[in-house]
Amino acid sequence: MFMGPTGVVVDQLFQSVHLSRDEVYMTNLIKCRLPGNRKPKREEIERCSFYLDREIEIVRPRLLIPMGYYATCYLLDRYGLTHTPAKEQIGRLYVSGSFLIYPVRHPSALLHNPSLRDEMFKDFERIPLLSE
């Protein structure tokens, strides 16, 4: 999960808030690698979402941090939260029952647009406060 250059970005983001991968539970919305690293189709999300829902039931997190558009849209839809334009979802805190949802950009965004660096690290600065 999050390997190569994207994995390096993930590690840097978590290290910036004094967390490591060992301290967080990470999973994917889509459980298989898609051909050509393409974006997931609606039916693929529908087929895989059962597993994510089950993981959330088992782990019972207090804070969900969806990384990227598809994970964010799925979770906001799943828990009946107001859907705002994608750009407005990033860094916004949503409350759903017993947990919080705090969407952030997908880490690969930094590889495609290095000018997002400060914003992405700033969004991560809130995570330790939200997880208390």
Regions found by a protein language model. Give the residues of each.
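A polyanion-binding, active-site-adjacent surface
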Residues: 1-132
